[in-house]
Amino acid sequence: KYKLVILSHDDPHDPNETWILIRDKAQALGLKVLLAEFVGTYTKKTPDGKRFIHSFGLDKEGKVIMPSAKNKNVEYAKPFEIDPSDTLIMARGIGTSAKSGNRSWGDMCKVFEYEGYTVINSTECHNICNDKWMNNLIFKRENFNTPKTVRINHPEGAKWALEELDADFPLILKTAAGSRGIGVMWIESEKALHGLVQLLYREDEYIDILIQEYIKTDYDVRVIVCAGKILGAIKRPIVDGDFRSNVSQGSEPELHELTEIEASESIRAADAVGGLLTGVDFIPAKNREKDKPYFIEVNSTPGLMGIESTLSGAAAKPLGKKLKKEGTSITT
């Protein structure tokens, strides 16, 4: 029986709804599934060479039961045996060491990679996708259509960056690390940009700041790609009174039928970052049938709740089948 281990971090601002969805679909297809919260989870080998994952247990709602000042006697769940020949590892919410403050999560996944496990997604893929500047470099290298983007390297770098960008206001300012539209700002003048850059550097001297040309649009598109196949796509309208389209910011997703060029370029974008399961975000071209869309970023831990409800359950089931297929291919 093939196994799926889902390693994730249950952030109050990014709840673990997706891992419950994936677990249920995978179990329905006959996979044995372990949900493990990154915090507190560790792995070790026994003297006879067998590897186990040790993690805290879950309650009936899938919430991790962790020790606290009021609940000090929480024990680890029964160790879960894994083997490269029959186990898939899915790492969600791994972030980067700068973002999470914890290198051990990525290091644990590297152990699995070194030992031959199929890890969805790889640590390299996570590192690329959790850095918007690295996303941009990959897009440029692989000849994707993407908004012009420049990195600001120091507190007084706004003027140089504007000259390098060579784009009209308004502009978009982003921090290199961030999700759900957080850290994305609308800039209307050089004075506003200069002041904001100085403020951000005052708060964090190691921050990475990007400025990007603004592509006017009524919506952007999120495409879920799994192992080279498209599971579904949604249109995310711009939020009223805002310029962002994240579902977490209030955008209400709708079905989106991809053109041939949108579909092929989305698959190519997922492949460019080495992703097995990704969310690819783009702004459509004016002539969608002929021109390439503007790619914004690839997400290595895409949430599936918004797209699953919009597609009426049409995304998670094929995902489960893909995971099962990946599992059966482990031994071939």
Regions found by a protein language model. Name each.
Residues 299-311:
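Glycine-rich phosphate/pyrophosphate-binding beta-alpha loops
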Residues 4-8, 19, 109, 114-115, ...:
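Active-site nucleotide/adenylate-binding loops and adjacent lid/helix of ATP-dependent enzymes
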Residues 208, 213, 243-295, 317, ...:
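A long amphipathic alpha-helix within ATP-dependent nucleotide-binding catalytic cores
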Residues 171, 232, 278, 294-297:
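Protein kinase-like catalytic core scaffold
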Residues 94-96, 176-178, 301:
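Short glycine-rich anion-binding loops that position phosphate/pyrophosphate groups of nucleotides
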Residues 3, 87-88, 294:
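Structural motif
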Residues 182-269:
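Phosphate-binding site of ATP-dependent enzymes
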Residues 11-148:
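Conserved N-proximal alpha/beta basic substrate-recognition cap immediately N-terminal to
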